[in-house]
């Protein structure tokens, strides 16, 4: 499974990358929105994991861009601030799941293993 991980916080990005690569996921990492979009232009991903707050935009913008391009990857938001308003906005932009930081590696990998992007709009789960 090919995963795009977009996270600006270095320690969180490295922790998530280690978590995924140890379980044999192929991971591309980006530190900001623009780099994430650049990856979307060049590669196909089965899943996108994006921080909500990025230095040059938001995870919402990344997922919106992916959906505009017809990308139907599983989309997981990660954030230190899982407020109900965040969940509402995620449902509108195509996130399937929202995970609070620090992300539990086993839980994340179980979502990746069990879930697939659905046809049509995603329903958000917390």
What are these regions (language model features)?
Residues 10-28:
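Two-component/phosphorelay signaling modules centered on CheY-like receiver
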Residues 29-47:
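Acidic, metal-coordinating helix/loop segments flanking the phosphotransfer/catalytic sites
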Residues 32, 58-61:
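Acidic catalytic/metal-coordinating carboxylates
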Residues 60-72:
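Short amphipathic alpha-helix used as the core "switch/output" element in two-component signaling
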Residues 61, 81-99, 110:
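Alpha4 helix (beta4-alpha4-beta5 surface) of REC/receiver domains from two-component response regulators
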Residues 103-116, 120, 124:
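C-terminal output helix
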């Amino acid at each position: 499974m090919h995963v795009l991980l977009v996270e600006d916080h270095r320690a969180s990005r490295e922790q998530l990358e280690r978590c995924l690569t140890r379980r044999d996921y192929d991971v591309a990492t980006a530190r900001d929105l623009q780099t994430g979009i650049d990856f979307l232009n060049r590669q196909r991903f089965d899943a996108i994991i994006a921080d909500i707050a990025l230095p040059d935009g938001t995870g919402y913008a990344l997922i919106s861009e992916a959906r505009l391009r017809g990308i139907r990857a599983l989309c997981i938001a990660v954030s230190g601030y899982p407020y109900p308003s965040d969940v509402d906005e995620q449902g509108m932009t195509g996130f399937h799941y929202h995970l609070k930081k620090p992300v539990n590696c086993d839980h994340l990998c179980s979502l990746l293993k069990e879930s697939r992007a659905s046809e049509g709009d995603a329903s958000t789960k917390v």
